[in-house]
From Swiss-Prot:
Name assigned to this protein: Ribonuclease H
Organism, scientific name: Chlorobium chlorochromatii (strain CaD3)
Domain RNase H type-1: start-end pairs: 1-143
InterPro entries, A to Z: RNase_H, RNaseH-like_sf, RNaseH_domain, RNaseH_sf, RNaseHI
Subunit description: Monomer.
Domain of life assignment: Bacteria
Catalytic activity: Endonucleolytic cleavage to 5'-phosphomonoester
């Protein structure tokens, strides 16, 4: 039976594009792990995707994951079938434009083949303590880039 893991993620950018950071909480039973990272020049969406990728990549075996994010971009791409359509359409949007962040989407796809992940949208900057902690981690990571 797969381990059940809960992950909260958030990405932030000071300017968009600009210096960015991401934060994640991984929870398994009574264990909670906090991770974060940054990039000197990036976008908010790249940090949102990066947070999910980095968190999932830390899992040492296939897991059943509930991943919570305040990123509509990330959650809708998965839950509304955008990601599947983009792949079928040679990474073109419905408007026939190139999908942004293909490199990160491809990394995420590989991880989604390993783990069974359910994506959940949470309201950002509200009363969700886990999401707020991820936001704090992301913002602290940005400070380390300057």
């Amino acid at each position: 039976m797969k381990k059940q893991v809960t992950i909260y993620t958030d990405g932030a950018c000071s300017g968009n594009p600009g210096p960015g950071g991401w934060g994640a909480l991984l929870m398994f039973g009574s264990i909670t792990r906090e991770v974060s990272g940054s990039s000197p020049a990036t976008t908010n969406n790249r940090m949102e995707l990066g947070a999910a990728i980095e968190a999932l990549a830390l899992l040492k075996e296939p897991c059943l994951v509930d991943l919570y994010s305040d990123s509509s971009y990330l959650v809708n791409a998965i839950n509304n079938g955008w990601l599947q359509r983009w792949q079928r359409n040679s990474w073109q949007t419905a408007a026939k434009k190139s999908v942004e962040n293909i490199d990160l989407w491809q990394k995420l796809i590989k991880l989604l083949k390993v783990h069974e992940v359910r994506f959940h949208k949470v309201k950002g900057h509200s009363d969700n303590a886990y999401n707020n902690r991820c936001d704090q981690l992301a913002r602290e990571a940005i400070k380390k880039t300057s």
